[in-house]
Amino acid sequence: MSNPILSWRRVRALCVKETRQIVRDPSSWLIAVVIPLLLLFIFGYGINLDSSKLRVGILLEQRSEAALDFTHTMTGSPYIDATISDNRQELIAKMQAGKIRGLVVIPVDFAEQMERANATAPIQVITDGSEPNTANFVQGYVEGIWQIWQMQRAEDNGQTFEPLIDVQTRYWFNPAAISQHFIIPGAVTIIMTVIGAILTSLVVAREWERGTMEALLSTEITRTELLLCKLIPYYFLGMLAMLLCMLVSVFILGVPYRGSLLILFFISSLFLLSTLGMGLLISTITRNQFNAAQVALNAAFLPSIMLSGFIFQIDSMPAVIRAVTYIIPARYFVSTLQSLFLAGNIPVVLVVNVLFLIASAVMFIGLTWLKTKRRLD
């Protein structure tokens, strides 16, 4: 009788064997449980793009009543940690040393300029351009404080201050503009990419190193059954890691979740199959655990960080690099998680990402199936 292409009896037996190996192997639990939580806490508490307290120097070249009043408004802001001095060289030295990130210069003719009709703002703001993000914060905060001070001054003088432009900002999807709320979904993607790739990158390589692959290939097992028994147990282990990441993100880190849990489960499964397939492909090619781990880290971690849109906007990349991002599964999972966490179920985003993730999973698992041979080389 011919050997069937797929026997679920053999698949079940091999999955039981693989599960027992996982239970007995502490490294699998370290990779699937400890490392995701550790990385998530590092991303959640260690990376913060919000500047809540900026160190700014105030150069007082004039100590008039108006200059001191504006300085008092600056120092009263909860966003400014001010260093006041009348010595320009001292403040410049502190800025060069990184002790302050910006410098507000109140010139010697500050009061006289303020008394003139239609006078322009007689202050100078110098920022540290080596950190553009912080420099933009300094500029924005100082401009905001300057406008508030002008309004208060006009009210005290019985006048009405009307700015030329009245900007009313609304932050959709992230009303408080908290950076962790979009960092954490991206961090979960990076973590699941690395975990999924590493978990399976060691599987086939370990079989070759221990000499058990020869025993497996000497049986009636088919390529499809071999791949299934390697994918199924690690799929459940990966979904456990995903569940832990979600619980920590929502209940400990406080990131809101507005999407469907069923959609999250479905898309997470597709993404995990892509990363597990990538790891299996690496393991099948290298046949060495050390080499497989190194290749998995480089093939999974670096592209998912650099080319997924997590840190750098894909639209701002050169056309050649943008083309490369289409084969990076993390690209589609980052936007999916950010959408589900912050905006909810947006079909125009989710449907496209699902299609690309299906194609990615089929590609990696298909390549692994082609590279898996039923003979010893």
Curated annotation (Swiss-Prot):
Residues 145-375 form the ABC transmembrane type-2 domain. It is found in: Cell inner membrane. Pfam families: ABC2_membrane_3 (PF12698). GO terms for molecular function: ABC-type transporter activity; efflux transmembrane transporter activity. It is a multi-pass membrane protein. Keywords: Cell inner membrane, Cell membrane, Membrane, Transmembrane, Transmembrane helix, Transport. The complex is probably composed of two ATP-binding proteins (YbhF) and two transmembrane proteins (YbhR and YbhS). This is Probable multidrug ABC transporter permease YbhS. It comes from Escherichia coli (strain K12).
